[in-house]
Every structure is written in structure tokens, then in C-alpha cells.
Curated annotation (Swiss-Prot):
Listed EC numbers: 3.6.4.13
Family of the protein in this entry: Belongs to the DEAD box helicase family. DDX46/PRP5 subfamily.
Biased composition (Basic and acidic residues): 1-12, 71-92, 356-372
Motif (DEAD box): 633-636
UniProt source species: Mycosarcoma maydis
Protein name, UniProt field: Pre-mRNA-processing ATP-dependent RNA helicase PRP5
Length: 1156
């Protein structure tokens, strides 16, 4: 034979070996071959006696026919040929013909001329053949447990079934090589270790899925990585269901079921490659739930092919049945002890102890520990594992009730949509960084100033009044502030010549570390009064690092005010090297999250969006850990526009020793006590020119006129203004958004370029409106009171209150949009005779600013006072007092009504009206009021409950048909009989108690010497009748069950029906799509079948038609049905929540696509 031919033979045999090794990854014969010194790639001499004899001796050349060193290659090829012979000997299949026409076959089998078909078995190897090579014990043990599987063979190869081995223990064939006792002991140890591992993996997969696994893991080791080991196995043989058991075994999930909250109580285990790969990186697991000694490992089938492949990739031998695992401490390769195995050997007692302690605590406290765990403080953004555990507890508590109605699930989904709660922080448990907030060192000229001179300066500066002790003296120059030079340069470049009155008194107080309430008229420089001390405060601290929150926070009630503050601070932060972010609702939150992740020293925000960012991604976007300087601008409106609960949530999560600053142009008395709750550090109240006063530079005009004359008067005023001054700006206030848009249309028809500004417009439109208004492109803007706060527009000469403001503070802020920074302006207010209840507030504002009060207005106020005294009118509200909370409640009620209406449930008003009509009808007929309506409502709610029924599903449900009236009556009778059967145990208990009482009476009579023969006979008769009745009932139930089993072999012991017809389309699709159904079946072990068809709202199925869309859940175990129902409820809630969120983001869109 030539060397070229021999190499061809080797290449072919190597290819055949490659095919076999890919189809059976556990074929470790090559590694066993190398372990005995037969590696063909090592070029070294070997003793011929160490090899077993080959049947093809004509290939064993002992001489080197090639001179010049080629004999070494020839010996190398010979070794390869011998390896190929060994593999052919071990393989049960017949190899393909080689390039030279020879065919390899099973040793000892007769050669056949034709090819064997796939359905033909391979011939049995002879018992007395050539010495068999020693195979790897792992391979032998595998053959004893793994089911046979088809081998993917190359073309021309027809495999037969593998030879069966009679024993489940590793069999070492007789060979010419003797195995030492140490190696035999090692093989036996290895087999036992593999069997023990398989048993432990099966128990762990079953036990870890129980409901207590999460609580133990979170309580004992909340930060450790939870691992779940899933292995594919067959389900135990139980009563058949409507889904073929063999088909279920073929299903295999390749996804991670970590989000599944249902307990995997079934014995169906999943093979998860991702979870298996995690095992090799763990050195220690958290405390596990108790191991159930009742699990019978004999029912657990052998591992699947996929499990073999995963174990082979991990370097772990597949499990093998063996004896006890007492001494299982041998590793596969180097005999070192596996840390995981060592831990598993000692974990049983620890797990049992932990489980007993936890069960004892739960029974003693009744769940008090969970309440304490929820109330524990967690720093926002620092450790989110506890927060996730609390969310899981809440979700389990809400979804743990199997019998939830459809409206309950929808309410739960709506609740989750709005759920944006901040975790309450226990500040005593947090070690905050110390910070300095007292930077003010007055210069000599201020320090030497006497108290009388300081009071005189305050009086000259618009009559500054201060409430509080030890207030610093007012400053008169920018150089007195101690600001950085770069900051003073920006002040000089902006043209700020001297501090305004509020700045003169507020800045030294803030820089001394005091909390203040600053009240000053509009346009008096309040923004700079809190911005400049903030810059000095932030520069004194270390820079903000990634994943840290801001140092200073400014909260405003409106988006426009937040944008304006951000624009005013930009020249300063650029010069000082600081970063700031402006976040508000209406803008995409993704962009704002990106800005926050870049770190920001200062955040200007509206309260709602700030809470969104604090709760986004479990608090990982930003946090309040480093906040030491807090500003509430327009503080009175912060506690009035519905922000009070949101503001308090944020404030309660900021460190208590922070510095808090409140500013506003108006601050009513009723808001003072509410605001003082947030001031901690010796607060001061600084008021400039009165609490609610319009600036003296603003001319105030009030006109009393009817509604139909207001628009013509408006056109007259605009004509006079723009004839006199073309570049002037005009801001017109109305009370409603619709009124702003209507007035906009009327002015455009008259030829005036106008735009509207209110909360119903998109944020982009609002920003463009303000930009065009400031630039002069649009001279007139109609707006609601959303533009009354903080809007600063140059050349704004005229403000018109087209609709009168409803309280004095709103009037002051509206008028304050003009006359900014000492300029002149005009405010004209229209009031109708029907709005006389607002006349008193307007008069108070006019008198406070020493403006002229029209006689008509005074007469109107006097007339209203008389009506009020006579009880014919009601006084107007002050505009404050937390009306936003009521508005939130109204919004929630409206949302709930909309949901009930969408899903066919009447709202409370409709129910009340129906109940009233029903009561009237019953009053005529003599029926008790409210009886029928209550019964109808109760039956409707009970009909929507998801109840776990004992026994097989009704035939009408299985046949997918709606019952007729007579059939429903018979079904109701059967249900009543079932209810009576349920009540029988109680009756039996009563009879038993009566029987015991009679026996006691009998014994007492005997003790007194009475004749008890007749009484004893009566008692015996009663006892005999009771036993006969019990036996008859038992036999009847058995007969019914046998009869049903005979007619329907798929009948189960428990079933439940989940109606899904009334849920949104996405929710229905979520629970009925193929992947979800397969996952539910495998994770819960119950049979789930889709029944019925979809009916639109108001449509009911007729008798004989399919029922409404529903899911039929069946199983022989009640816990499996409960798990399936609970998981379906969770999916329905999540899908409905997603629908509600989508509708909230894109209201009014009904198509599949939205316009970006």
C-alpha cells in the first residue's frame, strides 16, 4: 500500500469520527484512548503489546519502506489507522466506503452486498470477538440511562440500534489490559457522584420554584445572584388531560423564565442553557428552601439530549443512577473537591433550620415582618435589590388572589400605570457627607453699621420687613457678596448695576446658611436672589461624579418658568464650569435621562417630571443623596396646583439638614403654615413691598361691562395701542383653554397676528409661541393663568384680563407680567355683573397698590355683600388650600369611569340612577327596595370570578357551545347539588356533635342507675343510618367519576375558566399566542385550552353558538390550576397596563402607526 493511499484512508476515517463525535458529544472514547497512552498525534515509540490486535493486520507494517526519514511519518500514519480501527470496533454503525473501495463494518458482523435500511436493526456483535478496547466509564454509564436516539450519519451509512446493556452500573468489558482497584473505585465513585448530582438538581428545580423560595432568598441573601437550575425531564405519569403528554414532553423553552411569578410545582423541568452556564461561576449559593424528602427520584426520567450537550460543554459528566452520595467529593478531571458540591452536602440542615425559623416567625407575627421590610429605608439609587423585592412582594400579594374579577384586574393595571412612588428614606441610617452653607462674611462697612441704620436702609428699599431672629444686615454692592471673580464679571456684562431690594436682604441671609421665605413683587429680581448664593454653595463642594445626583434643585410650577430660570443661569454656569439640566413634562423623557446621566450640578425641574426621573429604571437615573440646596420658586403655587403631595415626597427624601429657600410674589396666610413644614434651619421671612401687591409702575384699569361688549372693547384697545406703538406686545388672559382658542380665532378673523398658550398644547408649540412672542414675530398671545407666573417678555406693554381672575394672588401675578424691571405697563380687567363675587378681591388688590377703585366696582362689591348676608350667594374661594388634591381625585375617578365604560361596566352614577328607578318600580309593586338591583349586581360580579372547580370541565365548555335556557337550568341544578354536597360535611359535623351529646346523656343516665336500653337502641339506629348515608354518598360520587372517566378519558379532577373576552386586544393576544401558551403549560404543568370566540361589546352568544372568548385550565392537581390562573392574571394586568400607557402617551390615536 502506498503512503498516499494510506493518508487518504486516514482522512476518511477522521471525517467519519468527526461525524460521530458531533452526534454524540459524550463519546469520550478518544479521551479514554489518550489516557491509556494511545494518542496518535504524539510522535514517540510505543510497545506493540500495548495495542490491541486489529482485524486488518495487512495494514500493520513493521518495516519502514521509505528511506530518508519518511519512516517516521509512516509510523505516525499507522498509529492513526489503529485509532480508526478502534473507533470502528466501538461504533455500532457501518461506515461508508473509503476512497479505495473498501467498506468498514461492525467487527464480527457478516459483510452485506447491499445497504441496510434505516428500519433494520444492526446485527448483534458476537460474544467471543477480538479483545474489546476499554471505553470511558462515563460513556458506559450514559448508555445505561440515555434513551436511544437516531444518529445523523453521512450519506451511504445506515445505522442500527445500539447494543443494549443489561446493567445500570458501569460495565468494563474484558480486555487485555487489567484495571487497578484504585481506578475501579474511582469509576464507581464517579458514577455515584453523577447520580447524586442528578437527584439534587431535580430536587432543587422543584423546590426553588415554590412560593417561599423568593422570600427566603431575598431575606437571607438579597444581593446574591439567584440561580435556578432547570433540567429537561419527563412529567410523571398522571391522569391524561386534553393535551397529549408526549407532545408536551417535546416542547422545550429556550428562554429565561425568571419573570414568571407562578410557582413551578409541576415535575416538568426546563433545560435552560443560560442558567446552566451560570453554575460554573458560583462559589456559594444563598440559603435554599427545604428539600422535600417525599420526592421519589424513580419517577424522574433520564436527561434529554439537550441536557447532555450542555453538560458536555460545561465539562460536567451526565448524571448516572447510583447509590448514596455520602462520599461524593471527586471531581471529573483532577479529583479536587467542587465547592458547589461541598456546599450542597452541608446545606440540608441549614435550609431546614432557616425554613423552620421563617415559618415560626410568620405564624407568630402574622406577616408583620413583611410590613417592616416594606417600611425600611433605602437610599434612592443606591441599592435597588430591596426595592425589587418589595415590588415582588406587592405583586405577589395582589396577584395571589386567584378569584379576581375582570374589573379588579383592570383597576390593578391602571394602578400600576400611575404608580410612581418614591421609597421613604431613613435618614438616620445614612452617613451623609458634611457640607458648609455659611459663607457670608460681611465687610467692615456692613459689620459696623448700626441696627437703626440698617432699618432705615430697609425702609428706603421698598419697605423691607423681616420676621425672624438675627437677620443679617442688607448689602448695597455686589462686591459685598463674596462671589467669585468670574461671577462678578458676568454680572457686570449683564448690566446689573446694584442689587435690588429683595437681593440686598435675601442674599446675605441665604449665604449665612438660613432658610428663608422671600416675598417680593413681580419683576424684582427674585431669580438672581437664589441663583447667586447657589453658585457659591455648589463651588464649595467636591465635583459631582458619575451616578451621583445634583447638589442644587430648583422646582417650579410651570414649564415656561423652568426654561426661563435655566436660560438666566446659563451665562453663570458657563463661566463657573458647572453643568445644569432643565427637565419638565411634555418633552421626551429619554433625552432628559441622557442629560441626567452625564451628571448635573443643578437641576431645574417641575415636580412631576422630577419624580419620573427619580423612579425611572428603579432609581438608577439620578438620586437625591447629594442635594443640599433646594429652591421652590413660586412656592405658593407649588402647594396649590396639585403639586403638594409630589413636593412633599421629594422633600422627604432629601437630607434634613439641607438649605431650603422659598420665593414668590404672593404668599397668603393660609399657605404659610403649610410651607413652614419644609423650613428647618432658623427660617426667616423677608417681604418687600407687601405680600400681594402690584408694582407701582403698572397702571391698573378695571371696567365693568356685559359679556357681549367685551370683544368690541378689546378690539378698540388693541387698535389704540398698535396705532400708537407698533412694537408693543399684548398678553390676554382667559379662564379656560377653549376660550383661549376661540378668542384666537376671532382675533385672526379681524386681522391680528395671534397665538395661544395653555396647558393643552404640546410643549414644542408652547416653546415656539414664547420664542415668537419674545422676538416680536407674534405681538398678541391669548393665554390661561399658566403664563401668569415667571414669564418675562420685554416690550410687554399691555395685559388684558378678558376673564376676571378668581382670586387676588392670580390678579397680582397676571398684572405683574408687564412693568418689568422698572418699566411702565398697563393692566386692564373686564368684569361682568354676574362675576360680582370676585369684586372684593380686585378692590383689595387695587387698594394695596394705591390704585383707583371705580365706583361701579365698589357698588358691585356692596351688592354682593348684601347677597352674602341674606344667604343668596356664596363667597368666592381664596384660590389656595390644596385644590390640586381634589383635582387628582377627580382625574382618577374620570379614568375609572372611562375604563368601566370601555369594558361594559356601568359607572356609579348610572348604577345609582338604575337603583333609584328600580326602587321606584318596587315601591309600586311592593317589593323591597334595592333587592333586585343588588342581586343582579352580585350575580354579575360572581359570574366574573375565576373559581377553581373540582371535577371535570362541563361538556358544554369542552364542546365549545353555549347552553340554552333549559340546559342552563339543569346546570344550575347540578351546581346546587354540588353546593349541597359541599355543605354535607358541616351537616355531618353537626350530627356527630349531637350524637356525642346524646352519648354523654346516656352515660349520665347510666351513672344515676336509670334504664338506658331504649335510649341506647335509638342511638345505635341513628349511628347506623348516618354511616349508611355517608357510604351511599361516597358510592354515588365514585360512580359519577367512573362514569365520566369511561365516557371521557381526558377528564381531570380540577378545572377553571378564565374569561378574557372583555380585555383589550393586546391583552387577549398576550395570553393566547403560541409562545405564551407553551410557556404556561410547561411552567405550571396544567392543560390550557383556548375556548370560544370574540364577541363585541353588547353582543351575547346565542344557544348552540360558541361562548365568549375564554381559557379552560385543567389538571389533576389543584395547585397547578391555581398557578396557571395566577400567571394568566399577571399577564392580563401587564398587557392592559401597556395599553393604558400607550393611550396616555398618544391620546386619540387609533391606528397602528403614530406621527413622530
Amino acid at each position: 500500500m502506498s503512503g498516499y493511499d494510506n493518508r487518504d484512508d486516514y482522512r476518511h476515517s477522521s471525517s467519519s469520527s468527526h461525524h460521530r463525535s458531533r452526534n454524540s458529544k459524550h463519546d469520550s472514547s478518544s479521551s479514554s484512548y489518550r489516557s491509556h497512552g494511545y494518542a496518535p498525534t504524539r510522535r514517540r515509540s510505543r510497545s506493540p503489546s500495548s495495542y490491541h490486535s486489529s482485524s486488518r493486520s495487512h495494514r500493520d507494517h513493521t518495516t519502514d519502506p521509505y528511506p530518508n526519514g519518511s519512516g517516521h511519518d509512516r509510523r505516525h500514519d499507522r498509529d492513526r489507522n489503529r485509532e480508526r480501527d478502534r473507533r470502528d470496533h466501538d461504533s455500532p454503525i457501518e461506515a461508508a466506503p473509503s476512497p479505495d473501495g473498501r467498506r468498514f463494518h461492525v467487527e464480527g458482523a457478516p459483510r452485506q452486498g447491499g445497504r441496510r435500511r434505516w428500519d433494520e436493526g444492526a446485527p448483534t456483535p458476537p460474544t467471543a470477538a477480538a479483545p474489546v478496547h476499554v471505553s470511558d466509564p462515563t460513556r458506559s454509564s450514559l448508555n445505561t440511562q440515555l434513551p436511544s436516539r437516531p444518529i445523523v450519519a453521512p450519506p451511504g451509512m445506515a445505522p442500527g440500534p445500539p447494543p443494549s446493556l443489561p446493567s445500570s452500573t458501569p460495565i468494563v468489558p474484558s480486555t487485555g489490559i487489567s484495571i487497578s482497584p484504585e481506578e475501579q473505585a474511582k469509576l464507581a465513585k464517579k458514577a455515584r457522584l453523577e447520580a447524586w448530582r442528578k437527584e439534587q438538581a431535580a430536587k432543587k428545580a422543584l423546590e426553588e420554584a415554590r412560593q417561599r423560595a423568593r422570600s427566603i432568598a431575598s431575606a437571607v441573601a438579597p444581593s446574591s445572584q439567584r440561580t435556578e437550575s432547570f433540567s429537561s425531564s419527563s412529567t410523571p405519569q398522571t391522569a391524561p388531560t386534553s393535551i397529549n403528554a408526549a407532545g408536551l414532553r417535546t416542547l422545550s423553552l429556550r428562554t429565561d423564565p425568571s419573570r414568571t411569578t407562578a410557582q413551578n410545582r409541576s415535575r416538568t423541568m426546563m433545560d435552560d442553557a443560560s442558567e446552566s452556564s451560570k453554575r460554573i461561576h458560583l462559589s456559594r449559593l444563598g440559603d435554599l428552601p427545604p428539600l422535600d424528602p417525599s420526592i421519589d427520584t424513580a419517577h424522574i426520567a433520564t436527561t434529554s439530549v439537550d441536557a447532555e450537550d450542555d453538560d458536555h460543554q460545561l465539562g460536567v459528566a451526565p448524571p448516572t443512577q447510583g447509590s448514596s452520595a455520602a462520599a461524593m467529593d471527586v471531581d471529573d478531571d483532577d479529583e479536587e473537591e467542587d465547592p458547589l458540591d461541598a456546599f450542597m452536602l452541608t446545606v440540608k440542615s441549614q435550609v431546614a433550620q432557616v425554613n423552620d425559623d421563617d415559618r415560626r416567625k410568620a405564624s407568630a407575627s402574622g406577616g408583620h415582618e413583611r410590613t417592616q421590610a416594606k417600611s425600611k429605608a433605602v437610599v434612592l439609587g443606591r441599592d435597588d435589590s430591596d426595592g425589587e423585592a418589595e415590588d415582588q412582594y406587592e405583586e405577589l400579594d395582589e396577584l395571589d388572589r386567584v378569584g379576581m374579577a375582570t374589573e379588579d384586574l383592570l383597576a390593578l393595571a391602571a394602578k400600576k400605570v400611575k404608580k410612581k412612588d418614591l421609597v421613604t428614606v431613613d435618614h438616620s441610617a445614612i452617613d451623609y457627607e458634611p457640607f458648609n452653607k455659611a459663607f457670608y462674611h460681611p465687610p467692615a462697612e456692613i459689620q459696623d453699621m448700626s441696627e437703626e441704620l440698617a432699618n432705615q436702609i430697609r425702609l428706603e428699599m421698598d419697605a423691607i420687613t423681616v420676621r425672624g431672629r438675627d437677620c443679617p444686615k442688607p448689602l448695597t454692592k455686589w462686591s459685598h457678596c463674596g462671589l467669585p471673580a468670574s461671577c462678578l464679571d458676568v454680572i457686570k456684562r449683564l448690566g446689573y448695576s446694584a442689587p435690588t431690594p429683595i437681593q440686598s436682604q435675601a442674599m446675605p441671609a441665604i449665604m449665612s446658611g438660613r432658610d428663608i421665605i422671600g416675598v417680593a413683587k413681580t419683576g424684582s429680581g427674585k431669580t438672581m436672589a437664589f441663583l447667586l448664593p447657589m453658585f457659591r454653595h455648589i463651588k464649595d463642594q467636591r465635583p459631582v461624579e458619575p451616578s451621583e445626583g445634583p447638589v442644587g434643585i430648583i422646582m417650579t410650577p410651570t414649564r415656561e418658568l423652568a426654561v426661563q430660570i435655566y436660560r438666566e443661569m446659563r451665562p453663570f454656569i458657563k463661566a463657573l464650569g458647572l453643568r445644569a439640566a432643565c427637565v419638565y413634562g411634555g418633552a421626551p423623557i429619554s433625552e432628559q435621562i441622557a442629560e441626567m446621566k452625564k451628571t448635573a450640578d443643578i437641576v431645574v425641574a417641575t415636580p412631576g417630571r422630577l419624580i419620573d426621573l427619580l423612579t425611572a429604571n428603579s432609581g438608577r437615573v439620578t438620586n437625591l443623596y447629594r442635594v443640599t440646596y433646594l429652591v421652590l420658586d413660586e412656592a405658593d403655587r407649588m402647594f396649590d396646583m396639585g403639586f403638594e403631595p409630589q413636593v412633599m415626597k421629594i422633600l422627604n427624601n432629601i437630607r434634613p439638614d439641607r438649605q431650603t429657600v422659598l420665593f414668590s410674589a404672593t404668599f397668603p396666610k393660609q399657605m404659610e403654615s403649610l410651607a413652614r413644614k419644609v423650613l428647618k434651619n432658623k427660617p426667616l421671612e423677608i417681604t418687600v413691598g407687601g405680600r400681594s401687591v402690584v408694582a407701582a409702575e403698572i397702571e391698573q384699569i378695571v371696567e365693568v361691562r356685559s359679556e357681549d361688549t367685551k370683544f368690541h372693547r378689546l378690539l378698540e384697545i388693541l387698535g389704540e395701542l398698535y396705532n400708537r406703538e407698533k412694537d408693543a406686545r399684548t398678553l390676554i388672559f382667559v379662564d379656560r383653554q377653549e376660550a383661549a382658542d376661540d378668542l384666537l380665532k376671532d382675533l385672526i378673523r379681524k386681522g391680528y397676528v395671534t397665538m395661544s398658550l395653555h396647558g393643552g398644547k404640546d410643549q414644542v408649540d408652547r416653546d415656539e409661541t414664547i420664542s415668537d412672542f419674545k422676538a416680536g414675530n407674534v405681538p398678541i398671545v391669548t393665554a390661561t393663568s399658566v403664563a401668569a407666573r415667571g414669564l418675562d417678555v420685554k416690550q410687554l406693554k399691555l395685559v388684558i384680563n378678558y376673564d376676571v381672575p378668581n382670586h387676588m394672588e392670580d390678579y397680582v401675578h397676571r398684572a405683574g407680567r408687564t412693568g418689568r424691571a422698572g418699566q411702565k405697563g398697563t393692566c386692564i380687567t373686564f368684569i361682568t355683573p354676574e362675576q360680582d363675587r370676585y369684586a372684593r378681591d380686585i378692590i383689595a388688590a387695587l387698594k394695596a397698590s394705591a390704585a383707583h377703585v371705580p365706583p361701579e366696582l365698589e357698588a358691585m362689591a356692596a351688592s354682593f355683600k348684601e347677597k352674602l348676608a341674606a344667604g343668596k350667594a356664596k363667597a368666592a374661594g381664596s384660590g389656595f388650600g390644596g385644590k390640586g388634591l381634589d383635582r387628582f381625585e377627580l382625574d382618577r375617578e374620570k379614568t375609572l369611569k372611562a375604563q368601566k365604560s370601555a369594558y361594559g361596566e356601568a359607572d356609579d352614577d348610572a348604577k345609582a340612577a338604575a337603583a333609584g328607578d328600580s326602587s321606584e318600580d318596587k315601591a309600586k309593586t311592593g317589593a323591597p327596595p334595592g333587592a333586585s338591583s343588588s342581586e343582579d349586581q352580585l350575580s354579575k360580579i360572581q359570574g366574573m370570578k375565576i373559581e377553581i372547580m373540582q371535577g371535570a370541565a362541563p361538556e358544554s365548555v369542552r364542546d365549545n357551545k353555549t347552553l340554552s335556557a333549559s340546559q342552563e337550568a339543569s346546570a344550575a341544578a347540578a351546581a346546587a347539588a354540588a353546593a349541597r354536597s359541599k355543605a354535607e360535611p358541616e351537616q355531618e359535623l353537626k350530627e356527630a356533635a349531637q350524637l356525642k351529646a346524646q352519648e354523654a346523656a346516656l352515660e349520665a343516665a347510666k351513672a344515676h342507675g336509670a334504664d338506658t336500653t331504649k335510649l341506647a337502641a335509638v342511638l345505635e339506629n341513628i349511628r347506623r343510618q348516618a354511616n349508611a348515608r355517608k357510604e351511599a354518598a361516597k358510592n354515588s360520587e365514585l360512580d359519577k367519576h367512573k362514569d365520566r372517566k369511561a365516557r371521557d378519558p381526558d377528564a381531570t379532577d380540577y378545572h377553571a375558566i378564565v374569561p378574557i373576552n372583555d380585555f383589550p386586544q393586546r391583552a387577549r393576544w398576550r395570553v393566547t399566542n403560541k409562545e405564551t401558551m407553551r410557556h404556561l403549560i410547561e411552567s405550571t404543568g396544567a392543560s390550557i385550552t383556548n375556548k370560544g370566540v370574540f364577541y363585541k361589546e353588547g353582543t351575547e352568544p346565542q344557544p348552540g353558538e360558541p361562548p365568549k372568548l375564554q381559557l379552560l385550565i385543567e389538571s389533576n392537581t389543584k395547585s397547578m390550576v391555581e398557578d396557571a390562573v395566577r400567571e394568566i392574571q399577571r399577564l392580563l394586568v401587564e398587557a392592559t397596563q401597556a395599553v393604558l400607557e400607550a393611550e396616555a402617551r398618544n391620546p386619540g390615536t387609533t391606528g397602528r402607526y403614530t406621527v413622530v
